[in-house]
């Protein structure tokens, strides 16, 4: 016992030995010295503690962090190793250069069985219990034939935070050579096109002018590059379209257009400036290059949607159950039908007024400028008729080209007019790109006209074309006639008798159906026969009327007297 006690009480001799002494309670003096030493270290008057690696320990670290647990280091040496990541708990991540192998060729098939391979197929990459091939009657281990090739097993990659987000990981730089070759082909095509165009200009004698216009070779290359689309790219050099976050150098930022802090507000998150930055400067919004983003609020279907919403509110006030968000399709169809009916009503109202009071000729009159040959434009003329002040009246130009004679014609197109057709005066031809036939063409045209005049006119087959007003009036009359016929037919006695007979048959069928339903409902649920209520045809009006007449209404206070 004495020797054992002496061993336990003896201090460790070597520096690497771990002391197994029980912790002793500190005296008041030792505790006070320890606290004073800590204060001196915090003030910088005493050197800081040093760990086993020679690193200083910050004296301001709290004790519950700097104190070492007994199960980590029983020697109680000052250290912060327990606060650092433990090596045995660190995950082993794959390096940045590791990636899945692509395009790996299968190895050559073995001719004899190898030790440790699958007994069923002979592959080295798996065992018999993991084999996915059909179980053979005699395995490859015993036959040594039809040995399957070894599968290529991809590595199990485990990347850290940066490795998972590395977009270039696994990229083969040799793939970029394909793009380089493609650009080289485009460059060769440019040079070929340039050489071909120079040859054409040299042959036509325009080479000097080209050399004077394009002095540098770079400008010439840009000229040809604008005409050729790059592969996979559709770019128009005349309309430079930029992305939202990319601006050209000449563009002015929205927040720099007006430096007054009380001007239009610029939202940096959405990069939007709703109001006009030049509102308080007195500039016309039509003259400035940028007048705010509020114009976007009135583009697209915004106005039509606002009109639909207004129609929904008005229809709801008048008793129609429509809502823009709840029933958008119903509201859209209702609004379209409303607009059509409104236009028809206006047209009918206009027609009725014109029929009653007349005045259609005033609506077909030409504009006042053409009718009175005067405008509000001020023009001052001299004594000789020349314009002194104002803009001279433009001479009306013909829509046809003047003084252009084609296909041997001696007159221009439009020099001849007959029966609403334009033609050539030289040959009376009404085909624009026809060849001139001269006097012979005139004689043929006159002979055809005389032949048509000699033929008897069949006036009964010739009908004068009707105007839109007459066609609309005829349609309205036909609608009224149809309505009158329907009302007269429905009031006839024969139709009424037929309807009564059909209704009687429908009532009998409905009573039979109700009796059948009553019998089925009296049976047990498990003994009821299968009865399908599916009907392919639509019920007639008489069947619906019979169903309504025979239907029981529990809410009706007189329903209890029906069976009496």
UniProtKB/Swiss-Prot annotation:
Basic and acidic residues: bias regions: 21-42, 495-507, 535-556
Residues forming coiled coils: none
Zinc finger (CCHC-type): 116-133
GO cellular component: cytoplasm; nuclear speck; spliceosomal complex
Residue ranges, compositional bias (Acidic residues): 216-229
Superkingdom classification of source: Eukaryota
Cellular localization per UniProt: Nucleus; Nucleus speckle; Cytoplasm
Keyword check for Nucleotide-binding: no
Entry keyword Transport: no
Keywords: Cytoplasm, Metal-binding, mRNA processing, mRNA splicing, Nucleus, Spliceosome, Zinc, Zinc-finger
An example Gene Ontology molecular-function term: zinc ion binding
Biological process according to GO: mRNA splicing, via spliceosome; RNA splicing
Residue ranges of the region described as Disordered: 1-61, 75-100, 204-231, 473-507, 519-564
Entry's family note: Belongs to the SLU7 family.
Subunit field text: Component of pre-catalytic, catalytic and post-catalytic spliceosomes. Associates with the spliceosome prior to recognition of the 3'-splice site for step II, probably during catalysis of step I.
Annotated protein name in UniProt: Pre-mRNA-splicing factor SLU7
Organism in which the protein naturally occurs: Gallus gallus (Chicken)
């Amino acid at each position: 016992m004495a020797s054992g006690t002496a061993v336990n009480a003896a201090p460790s001799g070597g520096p690497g030995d771990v002391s197994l002494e029980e912790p002793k309670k500190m005296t008041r003096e030792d505790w006070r010295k320890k606290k004073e030493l800590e204060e001196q270290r915090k003030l910088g008057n005493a050197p800081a503690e040093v760990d086993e690696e020679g690193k200083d320990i910050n004296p301001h670290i709290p004790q519950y962090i700097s104190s070492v647990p007994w199960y980590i280091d029983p020697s109680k040496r000052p250290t912060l190793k327990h606060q650092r990541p433990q090596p045995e708990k660190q995950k082993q991540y794959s390096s940045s250069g590791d990636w899945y192998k692509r395009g790996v060729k299968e190895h050559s098939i073995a001719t004899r069985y190898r030790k440790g391979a699958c007994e069923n197929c002979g592959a080295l990459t798996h065992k018999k219990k993991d084999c996915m091939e059909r179980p053979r009657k005699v395995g490859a281990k015993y036959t040594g034939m039809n040995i399957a090739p070894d599968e290529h097993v991809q590595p199990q990659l485990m990347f850290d935070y940066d490795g998972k987000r590395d977009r270039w990981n696994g990229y083969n730089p040799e793939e970029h050579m394909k793009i380089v070759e493609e650009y080289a082909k485009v460059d060769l095509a440019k040079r070929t096109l340039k050489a071909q165009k120079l040859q054409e200009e040299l042959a036509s004698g325009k080479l000097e002018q080209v050399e004077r216009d394009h002095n540098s070779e770079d400008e010439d290359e840009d000229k040809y590059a604008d005409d050729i689309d790059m592969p996979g790219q559709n770019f128009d050099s005349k309309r430079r379209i930029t992305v939202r976050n990319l601006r050209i150098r000449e563009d002015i930022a929205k927040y720099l257009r007006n430096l007054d802090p009380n001007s239009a507000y610029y939202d940096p998150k959405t990069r939007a400036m709703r109001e006009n930055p030049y509102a308080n400067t007195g500039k016309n919004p039509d003259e400035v290059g940028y007048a705010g983003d509020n114009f976007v609020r009135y583009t697209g279907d915004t106005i039509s949607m606002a009109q639909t919403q207004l129609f929904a509110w008005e229809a709801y006030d008048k008793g129609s159950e429509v809502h823009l968000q709840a029933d958008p399709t119903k509201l859209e169809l209702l609004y379209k039908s409303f607009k059509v009916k409104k236009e028809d009503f206006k047209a009918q109202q206009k027609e009725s007024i014109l029929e009653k009071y007349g005045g259609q000729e005033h609506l077909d009159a030409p504009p006042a400028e053409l009718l009175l040959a005067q405008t509000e434009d001020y023009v001052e003329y001299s004594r000789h008729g020349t314009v002194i002040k104002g803009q001279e009246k433009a001479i009306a130009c013909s829509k046809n080209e003047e003084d252009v004679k084609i296909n041997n014609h001696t007159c221009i197109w439009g020099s001849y007019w007959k029966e609403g057709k334009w033609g050539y005066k030289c040959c009376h031809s009404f085909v624009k790109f026809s060849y001139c036939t001269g006097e012979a063409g005139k004689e043929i045209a006159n002979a055809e006209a005389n032949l048509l005049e000699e033929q008897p006119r069949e006036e009964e087959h010739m009908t004068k074309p009707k105007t839109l007003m007459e066609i609309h009036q005829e349609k309205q009359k036909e609608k009224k006639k149809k309505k009158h016929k329907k009302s007269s037919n429905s009031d006839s006695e024969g139709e009424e008798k037929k309807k009564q007979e059909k209704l009687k048959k429908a009532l009998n069928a409905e009573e039979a159906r109700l009796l059948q339903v009553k019998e089925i409902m009296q049976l047990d649920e498990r003994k009821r026969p299968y009865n399908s209520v599916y009907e392919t045809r639509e019920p007639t009006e008489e069947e619906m009327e019979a169903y309504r007449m025979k239907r029981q209404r529990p809410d009706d206070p007189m329903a209890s007297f029906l069976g009496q």
